[in-house]
Amino acid sequence: MGYFQMTRNVEEIFGGVVVAPHQIPFKYTSTNGGETFLSLPFYPITGFVTINSGVQVPIDNFEIDGNTLNLGRELEPGDVVFCLFDKIMSPQDASNNAVRIYKFLSVGGETEFTPDFTAYGVQSLYIDGKYKTPGEDYNYFKTSGKVVLDTALPTGVWVVAEMSIKQNIPALAGNNGASEIGTNSGKSLAESLGTWIDTTIAIFEMTEAPSVIQTRGFYETNDGGAGVWVATGIISPSLAGTHVPSQAKVYNAGGVEYQLNVKSGFEISAKANGVKAVDDVNAETEDFVCLGEAINGITSRVKTMVNDEDLKTYLKVIIPSEYPLRIGKTSIKAYSRLKLDFQQASIYDRPSPSNRQEVTGVYMNAIERGIEDVRAISARFGGATSYSNMTLSDFHIEGGKFYGDHTTDKGVADCSTGTGLFTYNMENSSIRNTWFQGFACGRQYNRTGPGYYFDNLGNKVVGTLVPEVTSSGTGSYEGVKEWSVTAYGCRYLYLRVLSNWARFDNCKFGTYANWSSSPDGNQCEYFIENRGAGVVFSGGVIEANTAAANPTKGFVRDYARGCTFEGVYYENCLSAGWVIAIPEKSQYNRANGLFLTAIGSQFTLSSQGAPLVKFEEGYFGSYNPATGLYKTGGWETNYQYAGGVNTWAVGQPELDSGAFPHGGYDFKYGTYGIHYSGSVPDADSLRDTQEGNEFLSPYGLSVNSGILLFPTLSPAYQSNIVVWYKDLTGNFDPRNIVVGDFDNNNVSDGTSNALYRTNGFNYYDYGNGYKAAIVPYVNPRALDNRMTTSAGRKLKITVTSDAPIILKSIQAFVGGTPIFPPAIKDYVPRSQRDRIWGTMSAGSTDSGAYYGPLVGGGIFRPGDVVLPFVPFGNAALMNPASYTDNSSGFGASAETAVITGGATWGAGLAGATFTLTVESQDTINNWTTVSVPSAYLPYIFTGMPVYITANSSGGSTGLINTVRRVVNSDGTLSNKYVLYGALGAAGTTLTVSTTSSYTVRSGVSSTLTGVSGSFSASSWLGTASGDLRVGFGASGSGTRQTRYYYNGADVSAVVGSSGANALHLTGTGGITLNGSLLTSTSYSFGSASAYPANIYSQNAVTVVSDVHYKMDIVELNDAEIECAKACAKLYRRYKLKTAVAIKGEDGARYHVGTIAQLVMQAFTDAGLDWTKYGIITYESWEASDAVVETVGAVYDEEGNELVPETIMVVTPAKEAGEIYMVRYDEFNSFVMAGQEARLQALEEK
């Protein structure tokens, strides 16, 4: 016969055909011949094959390949193939090598057995060749690995168990065994295999009705649709010869009903329920197999859409990679613990004519646990579901491309599809490698909450979805995960997320579609709406492939509940990137904030760009100057404490503290530190005003017009300069913010003009007029043009009157930027204090040529401390000799001062005189509105008083505070200001002068405060004479003095004054003069009431006796000689009363001298007037109290007293009195003249 055949037949080998307990027979009789292979209904491992009883040699005569038996020759008609197979497996078991045989011969009485290898379940059990039913004849216990029998074994029977040795990989027949196909316990294996036919559709013509039918395919043999169909016992003649996919049922020619055998643990192909490709996805017909019906028919065999039950079962449905498949009669339903593997299938959601939305009123989703499903669950439990029942858990999708029917040439009424994937309360579920295109919405992961719900088109419907959520939500909604999922060309939305801690990796959201060109003109407002907390988007793309495809409001609408977007690229971003939604009162925030990092973006055209982050209008509040009230925003109205870390940031920002002087500009001191170009800007300081405190900071600089230059220091390369401002009209173009605006010739070819020039572009929009612009700093050489006359090192902001702004903060950051500006660290300004604009030259209102890093100027308030300032220029960067003191042109100050009041304009603004006209009075607030001539708008500043020198109505003059500037209805700034006080009726003219200055106090005191104890500018250094003044400007009289503490605690010396003409020096250990004590002839050393006790001198007193200093020089006359002779007899011995009081009567010593009254009498006796001579002096005084000073106690850091409080007598008390004194040098000279006259008279005798 052309092939080798053994001479021994099977009967000779076995002594007759005997089937061993663990062997499975297979017999095939050829009808027409010609077969070279046979398809088996199972997957054998080994086997014994005969043809016409002749044994076939493996490899030579046959091979087993899966479920195919390849023969060594063609069969001839009538040939009989008989096989005995040792073991069979399901397709999955075959591919996973998941089954192992355990067998033994019973000894009798056994009620249990344990295999000698690790197993995870029993697939089938045969005792004495008969199949046993799990749960009835035996039970398997996973923890012990034992198989427990209901009936003890007889002696000498074979027990054969097919054990699962692969965990969680069920066999064809599931957990209960590969051969349990609806048989009764005790049937032989051969009986349990049922009837085999080639195709399922062949059942339609069958007249016989076996209990079990196994098919090798659905439409054709081996087409992948093999299945086991079990008779249900129902006969429906009207359905004879039909297939009902939604129930996975078929009917034979007599109407006998069969249902597809599906059990928990199965991995089954959707082809088993008749899934097949359609010829035309748009065909107006009902005659097609709906993929939704076919899958639902399979899943409904084990799934109920009630989580309590579904979590006990598992099912995987494999959808063929065929093109195209159609969903048109019902959506694919989502169940817990269900996996749908769509592989590479292309699936079109195209409702049939009877299922279009104009007929049903419902837009069909592709995959759903939808609105009606949730309502059905609620109805099943009488409106009292559990948290678990309302949850869709462990639902997974793999692969597939889904296409809806929305295109730009159709309006929504002409379409019938809703959302690609629509779920409520989904948790711990995933979707991977899936594509959605042409739907109203790509995916919606919703939750059942109170107040509203979302429909299939993504519309928000106000109302209650089910009774359970009238007051609070129910069902879980967290842990959704996506990998490489794409949504493309969707009409309204690509993704809505109400799932907490969801994650989306490498997902794509985008379109070429210009939906505005559709009949409805309904362009997407957003691509993504995220309401979940802790949601992460990583490594994806959000793109509008054309400018026309941009969403109308923003790419992402986010509730900022601690969500992260990292490594995301968004393209053609002409709309806002992330729009922050106003919180809802019913929303419980688990965290508060938004974190964006490594965001890539691309602009089309040379536009000002759209903001990266935008807050919905009304999110933040605003101040209404007309009412003087603050209107709260939605965030303030609906805010609930986050209970988590706030993460408002883009990237991981760190302050570039060296980018600007003081780390940035906060406008606390108005114009401080700001240069300008051209004419003086029209600006206002909003410090400590309601307008300034409206948002982001308590300060602000309102700019109506001008070119402002902000000096930089050394910004880091690629530093992000952020300018926060309020756009009063909405017309400000952030491209008017520029850095690096100069010709850079520090390159080798010298040709690169403005190489590092960058413009600002929209960055943040807070929805209440406040915005932020970002200006990248791209110059790697931060010293370029430092301190030269170029504006290259400055941030330049150009403002025009049709687009005024309020500057709030300017800072630079590396590594990212915060969404809200941090406060600048407290600093002390350095300024001249004599001009508003530090760069203004003295003779012109045009800006000067000083371009140093510090420029001074500013608008100050009482209490502000201002440090010294000296401006320097540097014409040549590398030449220190080129540094020039520019004080003559730009002013300077040399001491620290505290502003106490006043105002100053300074430099080119000083000395101007103009008039204001009263427009109206507000008697309630005591305000007066005035108009200002346009030319003098730069001379009036909110935040600084107006100096009124004349009032035509006779009203108030002097420094009058400004309240605010009037804003026009279109947001532009008017020429009207509101001043404090009732200054006159409408039409009153007020004459204004800019000649004024600040009042200040200067100096340093660490322990004293207040006027009487602190230094002030006028007392420290007098401006006229340069005096050191102590006590100048004090409100009353008193002792003024300086004290010296030699050891830090004890007073050793005091210098002071206690009267109009009194200076006292007090030294506890003496007063040392290292120099001559000089005075004029007009002053004395001591006085009648304050005289020294002793004078110690190395030399005698030297008296001026120069003839040029004297007049009326004559010799003594006779009367004077006689008086002198008499005075010689007036020397006496005496004790001083002061010495007796101190030393006592015995201790006091005698002194020799004269007595003033005796000398006076001698002059009188001689007929002379003693008052005409300087020998006797007389003084008298009024009584006075003692002058004392209290020296405070000294304490250590812990409050312990180190030195007690002491009271020091500066000047002792004095009683009223008088005193006569003698000048001994003159008295002795007078006496000597008398003695000489007596000696001469004696000699002449």
Curated annotation (Swiss-Prot):
GO terms for cellular component: virus tail, fiber. It comes from the Viruses. GO terms for biological process: adhesion receptor-mediated virion attachment to host cell; proteolysis; symbiont entry into host cell via disruption of host cell envelope; symbiont entry into host cell via disruption of host cell glycocalyx. Residues 1105-1245 form the Peptidase S74 domain. Keywords: Degradation of host capsule during virus entry, Degradation of host cell envelope components during virus entry, Host-virus interaction, Hydrolase, Protease, Viral attachment to host adhesion receptor, Viral attachment to host cell, Viral tail fiber protein, Viral tail protein, Virion, Virus entry into host cell. One of its GO terms (molecular function) is peptidase activity. It holds the Pfam family Peptidase_S74. The record marks 1105-1106 as: Cleavage. InterPro entries: S74_ICA, WH-like_DNA-bd_sf. The keyword 4Fe-4S does not apply. The keyword Hydrolase applies. CDD domains: Peptidase_S74_CIMCD. This is Probable tail spike protein. It comes from Klebsiella phage 0507-KN2-1 (Taipeivirus 0507KN21). The lineage of its organism: Viruses, Duplodnaviria, Heunggongvirae, Uroviricota, Caudoviricetes.
